[in-house]
Curated annotation (Swiss-Prot):
This is Protein NifZ. Keywords: Nitrogen fixation. Belongs to the NifZ family. It comes from the Bacteria. It comes from Klebsiella pneumoniae. One of its GO terms (biological process) is nitrogen fixation. InterPro entries: Nitrogenase_MoFe_mat_NifZ. GO terms for molecular function: nitrogenase activity.
Length: 148
């Protein structure tokens, strides 16, 4: 098993990194690093004899977080990022209707459950009060999570 990334190499996180309970001072499930964030490899080690874990320093937040190899790409690799990601809290920007009946009001809060990049652009599956709807990116806005 050889590491894919070298010391001091700049890398990008391809998915949100949330606390699995191993980072003190953060609740389990708390957002630690947003996908698309960049950082630098400080060290690496092996977990369960079959996974390389990289110690990544994220200068923007001055955090050092452990990331699995499959969660990282080289900074030189093209990055196609959507605006939102799984579990993001959002607010609906306009009323959404099904067969003329409003089912989601403007301002209603929801949570992203899935993302999709199609020919018509980004769309998201959002849970609004227990009902899931596929909505275009223009219909929702991110509610920023407070990172502690």
């Amino acid at each position: 098993m050889r590491p894919k990334f070298t010391f001091s190499e700049e890398v990008r996180v391809v998915r949100a990194i949330r606390n699995d309970g191993t980072v003190a001072g953060f609740a389990p499930g708390a957002l630690l690093v947003r996908r698309g964030s960049t950082g630098f490899v400080r060290d690496w080690g092996v977990f369960l004899q079959d996974q390389i874990i990289y110690q990544i320093h994220f200068p923007e937040t001055d955090r050092i977080i452990g990331c699995r190899e499959q969660e990282l790409i080289p900074i030189t690799q093209p990055w196609l990022a959507g605006n939102l990601q799984y579990r993001d809290s959002v607010t609906c920007q306009m009323a959404l209707a099904v067969n003329g009946d409003v089912v989601v009001s403007a301002g209603q809060r929801g949570r992203v459950e899935a993302t999709d990049r199609g020919e018509l652009g980004d769309s998201y599956t959002v849970d609004f009060s227990g009902r899931w709807f596929r909505v275009p990116v223009q219909a929702i806005a991110l509610i920023e999570e407070r990172e502690e």
